[in-house]
Amino acid sequence: MAAAARARVTHLLRHLQSTACQCPTHSHTYSQAPGPSGKTADYAFEMAVSNIRYGAGVTKEVGMDLQNMGAKNVCLMTDKNLSQLPPVQIVMDSLSKNGISFQVYDDVRVEPTDGSFMDAIEFAKKGAFDAYVAVGGGSTMDTCKAANLYASSPHSEFLDYVNAPIGKGKPVTVPLKPLIAVPTTSGTGSETTGVAIFDYEHLKVKTGIASRAIKPTLGLVDPLHTLHMPCQVVANSGFDVLCHALESYTAIPYSMRSPCPSNPIQRPAYQGSNPISDIWAVHALQIVAKYLKRAVRNPDDLEARSKMHLASAFAGIGFGNAGVHLCHGMSYPISGLVKTYKAKEYNVDHPLVPHGLSVVLTSPAVFTFTAQMFPERHLETAGILGANIRTARIQDAGLVLADALRKFLFDLNVDDGLAALGYSKDDIPSLVKGTLPQERVTKLAPRAQSEEDLSALFEASMKLY
């Protein structure tokens, strides 16, 4: 414990020494000179979020929205399963009723790849659309964001906007077309964020595009769409909300993130925890704790499923600006290196570890590890999840939160760790290798992590109970 305390004190002292920022817009009177590396911590954060409209049946307004935007030629993106279901039919009826011409693209892949992104991009380029509508879960919304971006910047190479170090991570400076997102799952919060995630097949890792410029113009959050979701989809989507909230709330503060951008356009979408994101994260976590189990166990519980739909958006607002960290960074190779595992109640023809499941399975180990920094926040979140924290010691915050998470997952019959997905200790080097490129998110973790640390976290996540 003494070593942990010393590490925390050292970290905080470094934070205090580096919080001032030498920026063109920052008064030199109150700033300090950069350190030897030339890097200083940021001094500001931004809140960027899509317009959100919530209400049962609100999807039927989409045609009027597009008409108000002056759209005449719209791309409607969805997947094969949803294309025959009510959410898409309602959108098509609304478009037709309001005289909006549209083409349907229903080849979105669940857990998209660079290849499936490029197929959608090619469709968008050929269509010369003046607006987009995405109806589906995170896979559909992310695919539509990418299609809009690259159709609006037709001469860009695919890796130009992909996050470094896999891509070039260029800032988006071209104007995009309006995009309306209609989420049908309660997990990714993609209707609120400027992030599009995909599997980069060449390296077998997940990466993405992160820019405020690609966030949807409008998100239509209609709780009626949640009633069609299978129970396992509700659970795994809810785990994504859970970890979005936990990770954004326990991420390093924005004022500890460095370097400070020399130009505001270079400020990353994921900036670190901040006072506004904190509010959304805590509120989302409270909803998850109260309603997720109900939403999973009773498909007809409209109240619970409606609350989870809101929680997804709330957590999206939080993490879309604060960011996520280790659970998500480690989840990408878990999904990308899947062997034969196929999740129940997912109608796919390929092995699949749902994103929310890949994220939550490492959460007990991760938060045990990160709680050395900001233990008060870890203990607070454990209390929200139902742990008795009145007599808990602050130094046990990570263990208390980990136990609360294990109980929460056990109550929902979650697979017993990575081993249940087909992974073994022999896979750990590959899982670590797949995590290392995820520095955009892992650097927001409250504790730095070595390869040995990551190996230990994966090993601890092989079994949960």
UniProtKB/Swiss-Prot annotation:
GO cellular component, one term: mitochondrion
Tissue-by-tissue expression: Expressed in white and brown adipose tissues, liver, and kidney. Expression is differentiation-dependent during in vitro brown and white adipogenesis.
Keyword Oxidoreductase: yes
Presence of keyword Lipid metabolism: yes
Expression induction: Down-regulated of 40% in white adipose tissue of ob/ob obese mice.
InterPro entries: ADH_Fe/GldA, ADH_Fe_C, Alcohol_dehydrogenase_Fe, HOT
Record GO terms (molecular function): alcohol dehydrogenase (NAD+) activity; hydroxyacid-oxoacid transhydrogenase activity; metal ion binding
Phosphoserine: residues carrying this PTM: 450
One Pfam family recorded for the sequence: Fe-ADH
Major subcellular site: mitochondrion
Subcellular location(s) of the protein: Mitochondrion
Residue positions, PTM N6-acetyllysine: 443
Catalytic activity: (S)-3-hydroxybutanoate + 2-oxoglutarate = (R)-2-hydroxyglutarate + acetoacetate; 4-hydroxybutanoate + 2-oxoglutarate = (R)-2-hydroxyglutarate + succinate semialdehyde
GO BP annotations, alphabetical order: glutamate catabolic process via 2-hydroxyglutarate; lipid metabolic process
EC numbers: 1.1.99.24
Enzymatic class: oxidoreductase
Functional summary from the UniProt entry: Catalyzes the cofactor-independent reversible oxidation of gamma-hydroxybutyrate (GHB) to succinic semialdehyde (SSA) coupled to reduction of 2-ketoglutarate (2-KG) to D-2-hydroxyglutarate (D-2-HG). L-3-hydroxybutyrate (L-3-OHB) is also a substrate for HOT when using 2-KG as hydrogen acceptor, resulting in the formation of D-2-HG.
UniProt-listed PANTHER family: ALCOHOL DEHYDROGENASE, HYDROXYACID-OXOACID TRANSHYDROGENASE, MITOCHONDRIAL
Family membership: Belongs to the iron-containing alcohol dehydrogenase family. Hydroxyacid-oxoacid transhydrogenase subfamily.
Name of the protein described by the UniProt record: Hydroxyacid-oxoacid transhydrogenase, mitochondrial
Upper classification of the organism: Eukaryota, Metazoa, Chordata, Craniata, Vertebrata
